[in-house]
Amino acid sequence: MREMLTGGPLDVLTGDYLAELTLLILGRDRLRDPRLGYAKTFLRQLEECLGLARERGVRIVANAGGLNPAGLADAVRELSARLDVPVRVAHVEGDALPLPEGALTANAYLGGAGIAACLRAGADIVVTGRVTDAALVTGPAAWWFDWGPEEYDALAGAVVAGHVLECGAQATGGNYSFFTEFARRDLVRPGFPLAEIHADGTSVITKHPGTGGVVDTGTVTAQLLYETSGARYAGPDVTARLDTVRLDPDGPDRVRISGVRGEAPPPTLKVGISRIGGWRNEVVFVLTGLDVEEKAELVREQVADAFARAKCRPAHVSWELSRTDRADASTEECASALLRLVVRDADPEAVGRVVSGAAVELALSSYPGFHVTAPPSKGAPYGVFSAAYVDAGAVEQVAVLPSGARQSIPAAPRGGVRKGVGPLSEPDLSSVASVSSAASLPPLPPVVASGPTRQVPLGAVVGARSGDKGGDVNVGVWARSEGVWAWLVHAVTVDCFRQLLPEVGGLVVVRHVLPNLWALNFVVEGLLGEGVASRARFDPQGKGVGEWLRSRVVAVPVDLLG
């Protein structure tokens, strides 16, 4: 926060504190103390920077209110009084919905209209509960430029800018596939991105001078593809057409975003629901040296026998063998594979004493070299995230203004496809095995003429970034030249993707084509089970799937390797 306030000119400072997992954590906090439920980190940061923001005239907008935006607004007022820094505080509420049976939290994803109303009423600080990440930008932009709710193109441009900003340094070189091309000193501490937004919704992504990191079309493309799905990026304010986005260099560490078209938002709002799924425990057995497969089979049978003899057996048992071992290894660690046991049950006894008892029993009676990475534990509760949808008109969004007045915020106008932009259509990909949804596409390049190829990692020619949405994973893959794009769009089909990533198995995979970005976006449904909080697999948020894909070896035309 201090870096952004002191690094250069700024009108509005935004803060995104709410990942899907965060609301589950805040829900558990609120069970212990109903006065909690908001991100306390925001208050700690604000204590150091409130006076600075006031002095520089910077408005602050953050979704740190979590499950208790009114409580956070009160806490900010108390902080303001204690520091003797007078500020006008407002908050947005109405996202909290009646809880379905067994749910811990249920929150609709609101748009930026409530934020805009608070700013129009003179708020210096606006805190919200669950809003879309992009709403932290669309709200201030709509206030600043006095946009109406049907100025879809401008709002869509702000949505795209907000999506680029939402994950901070991921737009300035953080977690970037081609990081080795940058000077190491620039990556030690990447600066945060900022957006210069114009009245027509176009923007320039940049960063404060002198901060670390890099902003170029590659870093912005990577973030644009992160945690998205098709060409239509639907939100509560507008549906942004990602297939219309154009990125152009605008000087050092500056990328211009233009051409974004918008449509009316869908008639429903997304609702994030979290609940305690039950109890979970995990034991990781270390298998060192020879006969790894046989050792794994022995311990599986021994644990199954122990469970069969126990009074209560875990309802869900899964095993995963990771062959991290190497032959003739020079260190013990390199000679070892890991066998991961995960159990789940509604009864803590079934995942606690039963599992720890089985593991202890094996300590002197199992495979040679038996040991585990950590002592068996009692287990712990785990969370589950799911998404639902509710009619937008049924959600009563309210802006609580600095005066205390409550302003009802109507739902944005809903409707059909925006005039001037046709409906999504299937591109002509008859030559490739792909299910693809894209909109008003420019012609795809012809198939690259056959010629000599070389077996190289896919990442030699393309970048990738992956992320999670509930139990799904998206993998965005992009080319950096027209020639590579012409090869990529025809070569990396859904069938190819499945072959490269066997873990995908029989799951549904959808491929989306974004020609303006020279990019493909693959969505794998259900790869993460019930979401990050359930920790269903290694890499529970799917962050490394893109880099795994890049590491896979494919035949690439020699002409593209440079």
Predicted regions and their residues:
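N-terminal glycine-rich anion-binding loops that anchor highly charged ligand groups
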Residues: 8-26, 48
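C-terminal non-catalytic interaction/assembly regions of soluble proteins
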Residues: 9, 259-429, 439-445, 455, ...
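Gly-rich Lys/Arg/Thr-decorated short loops/hinges at beta-loop-alpha junctions or inter-strand turns
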Residues: 18-36, 54-56, 95-102
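Conserved phosphate/anionic-ligand binding catalytic regions in large, soluble enzymes, centered on
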Residues: 63-66, 123-140, 463-483
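Catalytic or ion-translocation cores adjacent to nucleophile or general acid/base/metal-coordination motifs
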Residues: 82-94, 138-179, 490
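An acidic, phosphate/nucleotide-engaging active-site surface
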Residues: 96-128
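A conserved active-site cap/scaffold subdomain adjacent to cofactor or substrate pockets
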Residues: 160-259
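Helix-rich interaction surfaces within compact, conserved domain-sized segments
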Residues: 507-562
